[in-house]
């Protein structure tokens, strides 16, 4: 027995495991200290040309299709260090907790040059920028317990995927902190601390996301071996620090709204709302922006415009990141089976004939559609994306087989090459039309395919990036909306003041947001219409309350709830 214990002594020792990843490449860390400088320097406040500079920064044009990062990086997948040490049983103090999420590292020389800097680095010993107490730890336990339960408090099998639960948690947190943001004013310190703290919790899983890449290494005998080396996941490493920087820029914009020339008046009685005009009575219960009688001063107006253009750049950046993440998400299998196999069935006869006429340009098709409301624009986008998916599937199938799937030997059979070319032509025109619609309606909510991608997504990294970028885009849009209201009041007070730029959205509908610009009549009808009936006024927005036409096709935009939509197949025909 003693001999056996001696032989197994090597296995019974306590070992400390330390795994280092590319420790010799500490300098290859991506930094984002140049992002804010590029965005601010890119503004051309005196010129309305809307062109972009050669450095790749974003422009003020609503029709920009490309988004390039304004960061300076040496390596897209820079190295990082991650150490797993066995945790001792007596280490339970709050001082030893690492709950900060993504740590920030500053280089002394770069900080002296640029003033600030940040890089993504995985270090288990970094301490948070704020102090945790026992209540914070208990709140974190409660939040992660609900995430693991999949929003099913019974602990049964009705919970949602972890990715969807995490996405919903980010959305709910942003709603509780920012809400509809009816005023341009700084956030209270308690809300800012809660936003930073709980976002660190929700982003903490990304600290441990890696991908294995092949690399060569020499052993002790000099032989070259090919091994799989862990690297930071590229999409997380590139996008998350940029989103965090954009987040801080939006918070700083709100913090700067002190000692302003505008203010808000609280109208608290319905009698006062009756005396208002029709346009004002629609939102008399909300804070109303006020400006001095002569209007804003030139310096105050310029300051507001400058901040608005920076926020607009942040809005475009977050929207671009969100769209790129959605493109990487796969279409769920249940949706693939429900989408009509024919693009003509998805588009309908009228829209299909418009795309089939090659002599008509995309601009002419867009004008002929006459999309007066965002509801009509979203419905058209849903049809186009469904048809585009069907055409892509058919092109892929024909290309892999090398022949038409229903090819016949008769002379009058369709030529597979000509059919592929026709499908590609229709696909390109449909994609161009969709881009045109989104450029004219930049605040459209997610289409049906995008919403189902989020609902069925299992990739936690994609879920975090999509939800984070979406909430920041919503916040940037609300800030722009409030700025647009102030500039509108300024133009009413001073007719000589310049008109607000096109980047500021209209404030016609107080319920309009990029995620939910148009609400169903079942949600909005009772409150708004009952108030208007009591006031004896008309809103002039009856067309916004119309219910969508009932349809069994995939053209209906689904709800954000976890309820599954019952989709019926539409029989396909031989037309593309």
Curated annotation (Swiss-Prot):
It is found in: Cell membrane. Residues 127-500 form the PRONE domain. InterPro entries: PRONE_dom, RopGEF. One of its GO terms (molecular function) is guanyl-nucleotide exchange factor activity. GO terms for biological process: regulation of pollen tube growth. Residues 273-300, 491-520 are annotated as: Disordered. It comes from the Eukaryota. Pfam families: PRONE. Expressed in pollen grains. Residues 273-283 have a biased composition (Basic and acidic residues). Keywords: Cell membrane, Guanine-nucleotide releasing factor, Membrane, Phosphoprotein. The modification Phosphothreonine is found at residue 435. GO terms for cellular component: plasma membrane. Guanine-nucleotide exchange factor (GEF) that acts as an activator of Rop (Rho of plants) GTPases by promoting the exchange of GDP for GTP. Interacts with ARAC11/ROP1. The PRONE (plant-specific Rop nucleotide exchanger) domain is responsible for the GEF activity. This is Rop guanine nucleotide exchange factor 14. The gene is ROPGEF14.
């Amino acid at each position: 027995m003693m001999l056996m214990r001696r032989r197994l002594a090597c296995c019974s020792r306590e070992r400390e495991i330390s795994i280092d990843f590319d420790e010799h490449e500490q300098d290859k860390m991506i930094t984002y200290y140049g992002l804010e400088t590029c965005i601010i320097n890119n503004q051309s406040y005196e010129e309305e040309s809307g062109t972009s500079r050669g450095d790749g920064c974003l422009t003020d044009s609503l029709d920009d299709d490309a988004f390039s990062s304004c960061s300076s990086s040496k390596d897209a997948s820079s190295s990082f260090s991650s150490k797993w040490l066995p945790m001792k049983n007596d280490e339970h103090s709050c001082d030893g907790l690492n709950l900060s999420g993504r740590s920030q590292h500053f280089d002394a020389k770069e900080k002296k040059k640029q003033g600030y800097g940040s890089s993504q680095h995985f270090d288990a010993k970094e301490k948070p920028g704020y102090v945790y107490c026992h209540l914070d730890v208990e709140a974190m336990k409660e939040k992660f317990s609900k995430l693991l339960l999949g929003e099913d408090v019974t602990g049964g099998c009705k919970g949602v995927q972890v990715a969807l639960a995490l996405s919903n948690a980010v959305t709910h947190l942003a709603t509780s902190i920012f809400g509809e943001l009816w005023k341009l004013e700084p956030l209270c310190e308690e809300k800012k601390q809660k936003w930073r703290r709980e976002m660190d919790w929700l982003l903490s899983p990304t600290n441990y996301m890696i991908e294995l890449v092949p690399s060569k290494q020499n052993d002790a005998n000099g032989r070259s071996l090919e091994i799989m080396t862990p690297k930071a996941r590229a999409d997380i490493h590139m996008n998350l620090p940029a989103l965090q920087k954009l987040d801080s820029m939006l918070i700083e914009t709100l913090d700067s709204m002190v000692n302003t020339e505008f203010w808000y008046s609280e109208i608290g009685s319905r009698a006062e709302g009756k005396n208002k005009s029709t346009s004002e009575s629609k939102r008399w219960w909300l804070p109303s922006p006020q400006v001095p009688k002569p209007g804003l001063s030139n310096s105050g107006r310029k300051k507001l415009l400058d901040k608005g253009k920076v926020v607009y750049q942040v809005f475009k950046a977050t929207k671009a990141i969100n769209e790129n993440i959605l493109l990487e998400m796969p279409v769920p299998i249940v949706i693939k089976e429900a989408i009509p196999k024919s693009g003509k069935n998805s588009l309908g006869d009228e829209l299909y004939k418009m795309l089939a006429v090659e002599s008509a340009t995309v601009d002419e098709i867009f004008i002929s559609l006459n999309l007066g409301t965002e509801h009509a624009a979203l419905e058209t986008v849903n049809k186009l994306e469904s048809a585009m998916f069907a055409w892509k599937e058919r092109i892929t199938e024909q290309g892999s087989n090398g022949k038409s799937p229903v090819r016949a030997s008769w002379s009058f059979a369709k030529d597979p090459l000509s059919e592929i070319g026709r499908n590609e032509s229709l696909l390109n025109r449909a994609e161009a039309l969709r881009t045109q619609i989104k450029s004219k309606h930049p605040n459209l909510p997610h289409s049906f395919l995008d919403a189902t991608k989020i609902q069925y997504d299992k990739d936690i990294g994609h879920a975090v990036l999509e939800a984070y970028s979406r909430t920041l885009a919503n916040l940037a849009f609300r800030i722009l909306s409030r700025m647009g209201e102030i500039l509108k009041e300024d133009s009413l007070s001073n007719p000589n003041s310049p008109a607000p730029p096109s980047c500021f959205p209209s404030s016609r509908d107080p319920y309009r947001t990029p995620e939910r610009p148009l609400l169903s009549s079942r949600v909005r009808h009772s409150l708004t219409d009952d108030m208007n009936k009591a006031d004896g006024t008309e809103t002039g927005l009856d067309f916004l309350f119309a219910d969508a036409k009932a349809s069994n096709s995939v053209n209906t935009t689904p709800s954000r709830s976890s309820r599954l939509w019952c989709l019926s197949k539409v029989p396909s025909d031989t037309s593309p």
